[in-house]
Amino acid sequence: SAVVSNIDINNYTHKPPVPFNLTGLQKEASSQFNINPKTTQSIAQDLYEVSLISYPRTESQKLPPKIGYKNILKKLKNQENYTEKEKKVLKKDKHDNLYTQQGKKEDDAHPAIYPTGQNPGNLSKNERKIYDLIVKRFFAVFGKAAKRQTLTMTLEVNGYTFNAKSKV
């Protein structure tokens, strides 16, 4: 039988993600969908050219309020895949003080990548994936920090030591 020799509980907060710059979008698309960076850049450029997203070749991780958060969110409300997410963001702050998580990198010429709110219509499978990543990240940057916990247990079994770790 095992004996628990130590339990360590660590509480912490996990901040919302920062807005996408091109590199961040490429990493996420590769991780989530195995889409290579060159293809991601090409798809993002195509989405930009039909006014679905902002300029994609940016290094900025900042979304200035002047882009009109609330207006974009209202437009996204009309897209069937995002209605509930949009409502949650708008309910978050009833005083029109929407706050976004901001990254460190800034590009004076262009803000981070964001959806324009225009209806995407028919997109290819990969275009839809990239567009969804951008929209979902846009929603996520308005989130509150999540409360997380790490639990580490040390177990002793027949003279052997085992560590078990769990994140909640």
Task: Describe every region a protein language model picked out.
Residues S1-V168:
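Core catalytic DNA strand-manipulation module of type IA topoisomerases
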